[in-house]
Amino acid sequence: MGASTGQVADSIEEMARDTVAFIRAMGYEKVHLLGLSLGGFVTQEILRIAPELIARVILAGTGPKGDRGIERVARITYYDMFRAFWTRRDPRYYLFFPESSEAKVLGQAFIARTNERVNRDEPIKISVLLAQLRAVRSWAKGEPQDFSEVNHRVWFVNGDNDRMLPSAGSYDLSDRLPNATLIIYEGAGHGAIFQRADLFARQATTFYLADK
């Protein structure tokens, strides 16, 4: 997203409208969505405002609107960015992965994979980060959404030790979605889908291709 141009939205609702506009501009009638973290908030809002565009949904490392535990994201982000600066590590090493030795090894492997290719993006601008944190804070303080009429197949995956977005929110949100399946990866954190990348890729492919 660092290479993107234009004005960055500072609300989940506006981000969702922008995403819907992009999907329609590309000429797609129906899409599968994978929403990770803040992207999961955006995906939930798209389910509400444009359900006709969506085939199946994967939500990963995210949480429901109105979960006040999500307000801690800014504090944790700043703290881990500070730790990363002093230890000369990628912030994701702290943000995405628990403190266990196995998780840290898998986290380092993920970061190494992302660094294999160069010139894919630009560093995220501070203005973008601040806009995202404002959007997250508003989401945490919002009214819970009603998904009782949403019949889309939804697969929810998270780790059991998500520092950024409380893992308990995964259970709450999956209960709100009538046709949702929740899988919790043991010993994984906010970056569960990266920590268990091979397993997630197989399961996600099976989910998206089911009934074809």
Stretches with model-predicted labels:
Residues 89-141, 145-146:
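Conserved alpha/beta-hydrolase catalytic His-Asp/Glu region
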Residues 180-212:
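Catalytic active-site module of serine/aspartate enzymes centered on a nucleophile-bearing elbow/loop
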Residues 33-35, 60, 157:
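Short beta-strand immediately N-terminal to the catalytic nucleophile in serine-hydrolase-like folds
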Residues 1-34, 202:
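Active-site loop/oxyanion-hole signature of alpha/beta-hydrolase fold enzymes
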Residues 163-169:
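Conserved alpha/beta-hydrolase "acid-adjacent" motif
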Residues 35-39, 43:
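Gly/Ala-rich beta-loop-alpha elbow adjacent to hydrolase catalytic centers
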Residues 48-49, 55-85:
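Flexible "cap/lid" loop of the alpha/beta hydrolase fold
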Residues 150, 156-158, 162:
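Short beta-strand/loop motif that positions the catalytic acidic residue
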